[in-house]
Amino acid sequence: EISLGLVGSEMCIRDRDIYKERKLLGEKLVSPILKAIDYDVEHTVFSFIPNTAEVAFYGMLEGFDNYLNELKVRKIEELGHNPSHEELEKILSWRIRSEKVAIKDIKLRTFIAEGNSRNDLAAHVYDITYGSLVPHVDNLVIIDDSIVRGTTLKQSIISILDRLNPKKIVIVSSSPQVRYPDYYGIDMASMDQFIAFKAAIELLKERDMKDVIARAYHKSKNQTGLPKEQMVNYVKEIYAPFTNEEIAAKMVELLTPKGTRAKVEIVYQTLDGLHEACPSHTGDWYFSGDYPTPGGVKLVNQAFIDYIEKIYQF
């Protein structure tokens, strides 16, 4: 007989662990965000996409509070032995600016709809809080839990945030780039659903590297008759020529609507950051392509073949 009290305690412990992990995912993004805003914390407003990214947002804020405290200490030390009250007050008054910029105006998520209806829905999910930043002066950093398709970014979020006239919009993903289908619970088997995959394919085309696509396809096709235990995930070769930053930059081009005034950048969590934040959870196959079973490799192999034969008509 299982004690309900014991089960409840274990669930509470697990919930607490998940909360800590999500906060740490946000905290670990401080360094790349600083680079994206050119270290101009004073003229940056931090926010989050409701509602799943809220915990990572708090972790990100804690990370920036720690950064700002270290900066305050250095600035005070530079004042020497006899700083004035005004000098100290000015430094100690520095604060990380956070606002709830994006508001979910209907309780719907875009993944519940399909096709065109998904795009129609995406345009109506979010609204913004005017007056939350100084137009043309402040950067806007806004964190989300993940970016898979990019549908809501392209159809809704970037355009809506741009109405606030920020100098720069930095979209932050608390998880790494989703590059591969899951196959173990989340139904997203089509390769062309992933904005990371689309970006990598576009980069290969632009840089006259279509031979990489052809080689990956033929390697995948040639192993279809093998036992699944002998199969290799050759889709990794599509991403291999590029850095995470190059792929993210191409995503920005693909997702930024025409007429957007603000400069846009996307910052992603790294795989190392993910593992450091969640050391007890080694499953990272939809980010890394390292499937835990041969069946996953077989399925991604077929998904890639299906995509190529549909698009390129091999």
Regions found by a protein language model. Give the residues of each.
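PRPP-associated nucleotide enzymes
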Residues: S3, V7-F314
